[in-house]
């Protein structure tokens, strides 16, 4: 049954307009993106099928072009639209963070760092550079590794902090496995980075581990 034949108050687009996007299920939001279904299948039914095939939104959003485009109802055009939407969201979050208030708690940076790092299939380490009032100067991806880990060099983080004239740094890396529990190596690295930055009077405010769910703050864990 086509969505157009549904009662108006049950259609995803109308429900979004009336009640906001938070009121919709993943399948309903995806159906709005898809716009149309297939013969004998509404956009919502197609969306449910795709979410099942990709094991949820994350699997769909992280799929490579070949896998994504090969699914009936998707294709290269939809892949391009999806990537554009994701990049718009990332840039919006970045602008929000840069225009926002002084960073004073880990909660203010979680969403932004998760959006930047969560979708990578390999381990990525980055730094968020701040001025002396903890306003954002910029974010840089500094190291990239295999799925087993990234080699992080404290001297490079120090060099980039000095280049930005940063007074403080927040670092983050992802766990491609999705597990956000910091490892002993993560804690040891945090101490090394804090010591290296301290030599040039730059504070390491936090180290986040990004995976499935809420990013974990090592500062909140008492490591910093």
UniProtKB/Swiss-Prot annotation:
Q: Which residues bind Zn(2+)?
A: 173, 175, 186
Every copy of the MPN domain together lies at: 102-224
What keywords are annotated for this sequence in UniProt? Hydrolase, Metal-binding, Metalloprotease, Protease, Zinc
At the top level of its lineage, which domain of life is listed? Bacteria
- UniProt cross-references to Gene3D superfamilies, sorted A to Z: Cytidine Deaminase, domain 2 (3.40.140.10)
Question: Which family does the entry's similarity section mention?
Answer: Belongs to the UPF0758 family.
Q: What is this protein called?
A: UPF0758 protein Hhal_2301
Under the heading InterPro entries, the entry gives: MPN (IPR037518), RadC_JAB (IPR025657), RuvA_2-like (IPR010994), UPF0758 (IPR001405), UPF0758_CS (IPR020891), UPF0758_N (IPR046778)
For molecular function, the Gene Ontology terms on record are:
metal ion binding; metallopeptidase activity
* Motif, JAMM motif: chain positions: 173-186
Any one GO biological process: proteolysis
């Amino acid at each position: 049954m086509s969505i157009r034949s549904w009662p108006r108050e049950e259609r995803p687009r109308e429900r979004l307009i009336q009640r906001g996007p938070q009121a919709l299920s993943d399948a309903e939001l995806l159906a709005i993106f898809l716009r149309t279904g297939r013969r004998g299948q509404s956009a919502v039914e197609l969306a449910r099928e795709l979410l099942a095939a990709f094991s949820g939104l994350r699997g769909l959003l992280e799929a490579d072009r070949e896998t994504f485009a090969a699914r009936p109802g998707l294709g290269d055009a939809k892949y391009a639209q999806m990537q554009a939407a994701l990049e718009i969201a990332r840039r919006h979050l970045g602008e929000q963070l840069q225009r926002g208030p002084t960073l004073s708690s880990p909660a203010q940076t979680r969403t932004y760092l998760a959006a930047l790092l969560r979708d990578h299939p390999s381990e990525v380490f980055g730094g968020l550079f701040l001025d002396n009032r903890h306003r954002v100067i910029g974010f840089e991806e500094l190291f990239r590794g295999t799925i087993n880990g990234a080699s992080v060099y404290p001297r490079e983080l120090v060099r980039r902090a000095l280049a930005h004239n940063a007074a403080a740094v927040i670092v983050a890396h992802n766990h491609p496995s999705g597990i956000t529990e910091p490892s002993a190596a993560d804690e040891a690295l945090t101490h090394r980075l804090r010591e290296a930055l301290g030599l040039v009077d730059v504070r390491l405010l936090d180290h986040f581990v990004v995976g499935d769910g809420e990013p974990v703050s090592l500062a909140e864990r008492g490591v910093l």
